[in-house]
C-alpha cells in the first residue's frame, strides 16, 4: 500500500522531467535556428542586398531549420531589422509549444491536462556595410626618396660614385656642378647614372605600387559594393603637387588614377643647393608641415560613409619621415644655418585626426648611409627615432613600415586593406 502510494509522485516527477527535458532540447534547437536566421540576414553577401531580401533570407533560414523539429508547433518568427548608417541589426524572435508525452501528469495537481509546454526565445546579429571612402594619397617625392631600392642597388651606386664619397642617392639635377657628378661618365647626374646602371630606385617602386593599388581598389570596391575615390599628390619642399585630382577633388575613375600614378618621379632640381637657377634653397626639399597644411584644406569634413555623397576620408602618406626645410625658430635638431633637418613635425597629424579623418602611414625607412659624411653629421643622430615619429602620425592600427629590399606594392596594398577594415569598424 505504502509502495503503491509512493509511485504516484515518482511517476508525476518522472513524466514532468521527461516533458521538460524534451521541451528544453527543442528550445535549444529553436535558439540555434534563430541564431542561424539572424546571421543569414547579415552575411557579407546579404549586406549588399535590400532589407526585404535580407528579411526573406532570415525567414527562410528559420523555417527550414525549425521544420526538422518534431512534436512541436512553431509559429512564424517575428523578425525586426534596423539600419543606422552602415550598421544593420537583425533580431529574430519566436514562440512555440512542445507537445508533452505525458499530458495527464499535471492533472494530479491542476485537475486538467497539459498537452504542451510553451517555448520562446530570440537572437540578434549585427553587421556593417562597407563604407564609401575618399582617399587622399600624399607621396614623398623629395630627393631622399630616390635612393636605390635594394641592398645590391645601394652597393652599386656607392661603388660607382666613389669620387663623390659614395652616394646611394640618385639625385636628379638638370644642371649639376662638376663636384655634384664627379667621376660620373659624361658628367651625367646620379639619376641618369642609376638608370644607366639599371639601378631601381625607391620612388620608381612607389610609383609602380601606387598604380597597382588603383587596380586593387577597383577590385575591392566592386566586391564590397562601395565607392572609392582617389586623389594623388606628391610633396617636397614647396608643399603638395597634384598628380591626379580631376576638378580638384578625388575621382572614382581609378583606371585614370593608376595611369597618372605611374608617372610619379623624384623632384627635379637645378643643382646642388639650387631648386631652380634663380632659387638658392640650400637643398631644403622636404616640408611636411606645409604639405599637411595644404592637403588638410583640400579634405572636407568626413561623412559616415553610408552613401557616396557622405564618404569617409582617409589620408594615405608614404614617406621616409625626414623634414628638410628653412626653419630657424622651432627646429628640433641642430641647424645648418637656417636649414632644419629633423623628424617630421606631426602636430598637423593631430589636427587632421581631430577632424575625424583617418591617417594611414607607410614609413619607407630612411636608410643609414655610413659612407656619406652629410648623413653622418645631420641625419644619423635622429635616424632611430623616425619610425616611432611616423607611427605617432598614423591612426591606431594604420601604420606599416618597410626597409631595404621591402615590397612596397605589398606594403601599400596591406595598408589599404587595413584602412578599409578600420573604416568599417569605426562605425
What is the role of each PLM region?
Residues 149-153, 158-171, 321-389:
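VWA/integrin I-like adhesion module and closely mimicked acidic/polar interface patches used
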Residues 38-98, 212-240, 294, 397, ...:
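Short amphipathic secondary-structure patches
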Residues 38-42, 132-316, 323, 363-365, 403-411:
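Von Willebrand factor
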Residues 226-275, 329, 370-390:
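Short beta-strand-loop
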